[in-house]
Structure formats: C-alpha cells, structure tokens
Amino acid sequence: MTDRIVPATLVFREDGTVVSPLYGDIYHSAAGALAQADHVFIRGNGLPERWRHERAFTIIETGFGTGCNFLATWAAWRADPSHCERLHFVSVEKHPFAREDLRRAAAHIVAYTTITTITPIAPLVDELANAWPALTPGVHRLEFDDGRVTLTLVFGDALDVLPNLALRAHAFYLDGFAPSKNADLWSPAIFKSLAKLADERATFATYTSSGAVKRALDEAGFAYRKVDGFAGKRAMLVGEFAPRWRVRRHEPPRAFSTDRRDAIVIGAGLAGCAVVERLAARGWHVTLIERRERIASEASGNPAGVFHPMIARDDNLAARLSRAGFLHALHRWRALERAGHAFSRSTHGLVQLATSDDEFERMRESIDALGVPAELASALSRDDARALLRTDVAHGGWLFAQGGSISPAALAAAQCAAAGDRLSRIVGVEIARLERGGDGRWRALDASGATIAQASVVVVANAADAARIAGLRHAPTQRVRGQLTLLPPGSAPAVPLPVIGDGYVVPLANGVTLTGATYEPDDTDATPREAGHRENLERLERLLPAFSANALDAGALAGRVGFRCVASDRLPLVGELGDEAAAAREAAALTGARLRDVPRATGLYGAFGYGSRGLVWATLGAELIAAQIDGEPWPLERELAEAIDPARFLVRALRHGRVA
C-alpha cells in the first residue's frame, strides 16, 4: 500500500525563518530564502545562461519545502528575454505543506526578501498556492504561464520516488535539511538515482559541502568543486555529471528527433482530442482523422459521462492511475475553461453508494487507512446520503467533492478549439493501415492504398480498431457494448448530482435523467434494445429504492448504444508502440526482456483501451504521449507508465516464447 502523506507543520522562528519541528532545522538561511535560491541554485547551475541553448530545460529539486527555489527560478525565467521555450521544474517532497500553510510561508518569505535582480515574485505565490494539489502520494503536474512553465511535484520519500521517475535532467537543485538532520536525503542511493536521470551536460549545486556528500557525489559519477557559499558561508558545492565509468544501464528519455513537428491522430473521441490539444500546445501541427462525419460520434457521443477516482484499500495500480488521471484532468479542464474554451460539466460532486453495509464499512476503512483528503473523497453515512440526494438510499457511500458528470462531446470540442490553427481535420474517412516510408515519415492509407495524410508521428486513438490499423498482434482488446437509457422528466428521483454504484444516474438538462449502462462483451448490435432498457431500470431501482422499474414501459424509452474498448488486464494502452517485427527477429535475445529493452516503432504511439474511464484517463494519457514525444518529464511514475505501456503484452509473449 502507498504510504500516506504526512503534511509539514508551519513554524516561524523569531528571526522570521521557517523551521521544521520534525527535523529540527530551518528551511532557509536567515539571510533570505530567495537570495539563497538565487546564489546557490540558479547561479550555481549557470542559469539563466544555460537554458538559453535548449528548447526545453528540466530541473530536479530534492526538497520542495516552501517553494522558494521554484518561485525564484520561475521569476528568473520570466525576467530572461532569451529563456528556453519550456521550463520543467520537478521537485520531490516527503512532507508537503497544506495549501494555506504554503501560501503563508511563501508570502512571508517574499515579503521580507531583499532580492532586486529578478522579476517580482509576490504575484507568483498566489498562482502557486491556488494550483496546489491535494496531498496524495504520487506525481502532480501543474502548469503556469500558458503551459510554458511546468511544476511536477512528486509527493513521497525521495528514496522511493526518485528511482521511479522518467526524465532527462539538465540541472539538479540538491536541497533539503542538513545531512546531519536528514541523512537519508543525502545518502549514496539518492545520488545514484539522480545519476540515472542526468543529461550528459547536467550540473548540480548544493548549499552543503560535507565530506559524506562529496563522497556520495563522486561515487555516483558527479565531479564537484567548492565555491564561495551564501551569506558568509565559507563554501558550497557545484559541479557536473562526469562519470568515469558506466553508472546506468539505460539512458534517460530523449525527445523524438524530427525536423518537422507534425503529427497524425486517428480517432476523434476523448482519447484522440486530448492528444490533439496536448500536442498543439507544444507547437505540433496535427491532422485529426475521423471515420464519422463529426468528432465524438462513437462512445464519446454519449449525453454525459461520470468522472471520479477509484479508491482501493491496497491502493493498487488501477486506483493510483485513476487518482492521477482524475486530478490531472481537473487541472487541465480548468486551464481550458480559463482560456475561454468552456464546456458542460457539473461541479457539485458525485456520490458512490455501497451495495451492502459490509461494502460501506470497507469503503470507510479504506479512506481512513489511506489518509484520503476530504477534498478528494469522504465517507457518507446512509442518513447523510439521503439528505444530500433528497431521496431514499439503501446504504451509505463516498462523496467525491470534485467528481461529477461532463459532456464528452463538449470536452472534445473544447480541446480541438484550444488547438486553434495547428489542427486540420479530415472526417468521413477510414484509415485501413499505416506505413513508414524510407524518409522516416508515416503515411495513413485508406482501403484502396491511397495516402490520406503523412507526418513524422502517428497516434492511434480509435479504440478497438487501433491495434488492427497499427498492425499489432500482441494488444488484446475487446469491444464491449454499453446501452444507456434516457428517462423523461418526473419519472425518476430528482437527484441533484450524479450517483453511481451498481450502475449510475445522471441528472441532465430539462429534467431528463440518464441511467445505465449495460456491459455486453462481443455484442456488436448498435441498436438500443428493450431488454437493455429493462436491465438499466432494474439497476436504477437497486441504486435508488424510491424508483420503481415497473413504473415505466421499457419499450417506449429512448437510449443510445456505445462500444467500450477494454484490454484483457482492464488497463489502457498508452505510449510508444512496440515494433513487433523487430521483436520477432530478436526474440531469442529478448526472452528476459524488460519494457525498456523492447524495440519500438519509432514515431508510432497509442491511446486506446480506456474502457469506461475515458474521462479519467484520456487527459493524463495524452500528456504522457506528448511528454514522451518531446523528451519531457513524464507526468506519472515509471511504474504506472509501464503498467499501461502498449508493449507490455509483447513483453509477456516474448517471455513465453510466443513471438516468431
């Protein structure tokens, strides 16, 4: 089970410095946190000069603390007219502050700063605090300045989380409490993990100059030297990654190499439109190809869908992925709305009801055991659920305060609108196969062999057809029919917010109620059936006892059928596809392969198999693909990325000798 997050306690000393009662040490020098950040970390890493030579520049910090190093770096980036196009700041923190404590600490530090060489920082404090995520374990990606500055927070113990990151770092801010106060953060294991993430020209800087730290740096392949410390401190350490021997088996991720930043996305549902928006935001020109005459015509065309995280007592992979996807989606959706691309979604929460008293107790115990913050989920007794929903319920459940319902088609349209003139659409055309030419560019061909479009990169995001178009034999997915039912006004309890459990009920405009959905594997009938409506009515009756399934004529009801694409392990397929032909040629040498050993289909990516969780997973999946293409820090732990890697089935087949 993932360790729960224990927040930091905010304490000020008489001299105004912020101190940690847990570690018995200060967060910054009494001479000023921002001045310290500028002297030690920014100038110690040769910034801002060094980032001027990169399209994207990545910094890793080993302790976020009050956020002053990030704020000072962000301000320095803003003040530099020749700054890099995108700045990535990745910071690990075991004990993050709660939102308002962070705001108080950072605002206090900024108010007493004496630094004058960089742009004003006070306006940035509120931006950071307002975007501050729920204190849950894992990776949290925040974006500022229209996405040009990205803060990737990693909440957890550095010893555990650093080996699980996927990125290429240009600079390291080695910050944290003194080695004598927090020895684990300065242990050899930390520096070995950092060495696996270092660019060949990576630099580092740190306030400390202890002998133990110097030895650990040297053993990990970093060359160091002493320079004048901050505020009268005799020395601090700076240096660069300069290994004298091989210190890693795999190189950190690199950007996809191409002279033309153009891409094809096949499939204009939730998966594809999310990819379009994320690539266009990075300057890619995208051609979106959809076999229907308009976007979001398949399962994404449902009147509404629900979104919420999944909670499991053991915090398994699916639960962690859903939490990461849910929180990332909320962040991105708010950014779309702020940019003027509004879409229809409810904002009053969502209730998940238990199906038995025993299940309710397990649900309540899971929240307590995991330390789930109330802003994410809270237990709801039966009486409280009745009062909130204004109707009878059989059991209590969970309240997801930020969950709700959304129009998938409206979201897809907003994402395409955000792409602006970087998006070209081709509709009413079905792609039969893909072909990579001798020039390294991919061509999307129709059934006659005609080239519909060509580009450096292709993302297949067309659900159950994706594996066929990409020529994958080792990507087992299944089409699952789902029928939903629309109930006329006044025929169902008028719940004020979406309710899920054994099925779901969503209040729509004009008093209409949406309920569903059936789950019918390998059923290809696209016509709504009376039996499906009856099943949905019976499910609704179990969910809300005040409703009677027999009160309505199932044969007279309207509805819709969509088809989910579900992988055999119930997790999506997101990321760079494996090169199955190359793997077959090298099969004898790959029987013990890991995912990083498998040959890849250069420039070919997948985003499919989202099942019923497209709203939760599609935005995060799109960010992962865009990060992989552009060589940016991944927005989730490597362990989670590997759990949804499309090549995972190829690896399993290789291990069992089934690839030839």
Swiss-Prot record:
Task: Write down the EC number.
Answer: 2.1.1.61, 1.5.-.-
**UniProt keywords, alphabetically:** Cytoplasm, FAD, Flavoprotein, Methyltransferase, Multifunctional enzyme, Oxidoreductase, S-adenosyl-L-methionine, Transferase, tRNA processing
Q: Which organism is it from?
A: Burkholderia pseudomallei (strain 1710b)
Q: Which GO terms describe its biological process?
A: methylation; tRNA wobble base modification
Q: What is this protein called?
A: tRNA 5-methylaminomethyl-2-thiouridine biosynthesis bifunctional protein MnmC
Entry's Gene Ontology cellular component terms: cytoplasm
Q: Where is this region: FAD-dependent cmnm(5)s(2)U34 oxidoreductase?
A: 266-660
Where in or outside the cell it occurs: the entry states: Cytoplasm
